[in-house]
Amino acid sequence: RDRLRSRGLGDVYKRQLANIFKEIHQDLGKPIPTSGNLDRWVEQGVFPMNSVLTVRAHETGSHRNMGWETFTDAVIKKLSDGRENLVFMLWGSYAKEKIALIDTHKHLVLTTVHPSPRSADHGFFGCKHFSKANTFLQSKGIQKIDW
């Protein structure tokens, strides 16, 4: 049943998800979950996606430039062109490059550093992307996300 969870992922990815939960807690006062299960987000329309969908164990970026970018760029472009009032959260310098694929007149684009343990203290913590996303959605008459 669980579609998206951190179980089975390496420690680096668990720490990134923990940093995301920590920011949600700081931003919205939500309790930090005890599980990495993201099904509740998906059921509300959240689509968590990395630019590169696989990696060799313990080798960050090892599958970059192996073709994933073509696919994920097409997904981003299709969503941008085919929908309105989406929120794109682009975290990290590599993700920020994807802004060229997004119609910023139709969508909200939020950028900051990556939530990795190495960079989260340099702008991810305190970015308030989750409350900003909800404010934008509500301003468009769309139900906010229960993060």
Question: Where are the model-predicted features located?
Answer:
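C-terminal capping/extension of enzyme domains
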Residues: 15-17, 21-30, 53-84, 94-147
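Short, charged beta->alpha transition segments
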Residues: 12, 32-39
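Single conserved hydrophobic/aromatic residue that forms the stacking wall/gate
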Residues: 1-13
